[in-house]
């Protein structure tokens, strides 16, 4: 099995460039049962009920893209991926990495500069942020939202690339399935007997990275930090159904079931996969040849191809600011055929 097994034709016109003003007005392809029903996310409370646990990833996107100038002239760019030390050291994607020797200092403004450190390969470097005050305050002041490369329209309101329940600024990308939810939708779910729980998985760049190897056995996921609180784990154990909002939530829950409630995970969810926690997935429509589609096949089976065809034919909007799908976990075929 290789990346070509997860290829499909995605027209540019199907890629949503801007978010909807009304978040839950996004369309929802309800494929939990055998019959596909066209709904909106606002219908979600009617599709869940007592005993269900809805789990969200409450990470917040850090405005982590820093545009810098070199003292010798020219420009550079740093995308902060994760903090390493309390002294302002980060792992970052640096461009142009090969032209910046270790020890090079780049200026963001008069107060914030970046010292380029060890080469980690793949364009990644250790960098140290130097400023007179708190580092995160400087990043929020100077940084830009690291939007996916397929979004070419200027985002007028950066908060539209944040979930309404986001907390700690740490991620390089949003857990986009959660962008559709509002407090009103979540309150309606609670009123119907649904328990809402949260976890944190710090989303990295694998969200945007296509699979480039010919064999999935050779694909390696970058590690991401995650933490699943004890209350979330307990709720999932007692749930009638665990409904994960987004692929990052799936990755965190299934990592916790294997490796413990907190840590760094490089779990690559691919067929065949033994899901131990998640029963239903709320997810956006993903890029061709991506690890997220591989996860979707592991979860829902090859049916996703038919569902994507239906969505494209019916004018659904795809990718980060696009519409959503609700799908149940495929059951093992025990027919012996």
Which residues does each PLM region occupy?
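Surface-exposed, charge/polar-rich loops and edge strands
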Residues: 1-337
